[in-house]
């Protein structure tokens, strides 16, 4: 199956698994998705993730995080889409919910949070907001 926007597909899979209270979710592998999941892990939105399989069957198994009966992820939104790319310069990077959430940005130095991009003084494509 061909997916036109793999990052949106990953976000929808995570949101659907959260709504159904699943412990894990499988996502087709890509380097960019692995970097995004690394950010989610460092920011405390997921418990862990591991890479499984090889070649075309390679997947990312994500262990979702819950606090009691409540998901650690309140909402996860895709910002820049294939039909409408959204870019931000280093001095125009905004935060989500006054710093409560996380902005994920793809820069020339890799995928990082808005805070890291400010420290590195780089802008880029705004991939997603999560809180």
UniProtKB/Swiss-Prot annotation:
Domain of life: Bacteria
GO biological process, one term: translation
Key words of the record: Ribonucleoprotein, Ribosomal protein, RNA-binding, rRNA-binding
GO molecular function: rRNA binding; structural constituent of ribosome
Disulfide-bond pairs as recorded: none
Gene3D superfamilies: 3.30.1370.30, 3.30.1490.10
Protein name in the entry: Small ribosomal subunit protein uS8
Organism: Mycoplasmopsis agalactiae (strain NCTC 10123 / CIP 59.7 / PG2)
GO CC annotations on file: ribonucleoprotein complex; ribosome
Family affiliation: Belongs to the universal ribosomal protein uS8 family.
Subunit structure as annotated in this protein's UniProt entry: Part of the 30S ribosomal subunit. Contacts proteins S5 and S12.
Role according to the record: One of the primary rRNA binding proteins, it binds directly to 16S rRNA central domain where it helps coordinate assembly of the platform of the 30S subunit.
Coiled-coil region(s): none
């Amino acid at each position: 199956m061909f997916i036109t926007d793999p990052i949106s597909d990953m976000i929808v899979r995570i949101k659907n698994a959260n709504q159904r209270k699943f412990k894990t979710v499988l996502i087709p592998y890509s380097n960019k998705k692995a970097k995004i999941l690394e950010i989610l892990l460092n920011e405390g939105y997921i418990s862990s993730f591991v890479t499984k399989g090889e070649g075309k069957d390679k997947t990312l198994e994500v262990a979702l995080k819950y606090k009691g009966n409540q998901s650690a992820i309140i909402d996860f939104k895709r910002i820049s889409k294939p039909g409408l790319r959204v870019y931000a310069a280093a001095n125009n990077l905004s935060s989500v919910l006054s710093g409560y959430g996380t902005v994920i940005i793809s820069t020339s130095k890799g995928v990082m949070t808005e805070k890291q991009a400010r420290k590195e003084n780089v802008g880029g494509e705004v991939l997603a907001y999560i809180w």
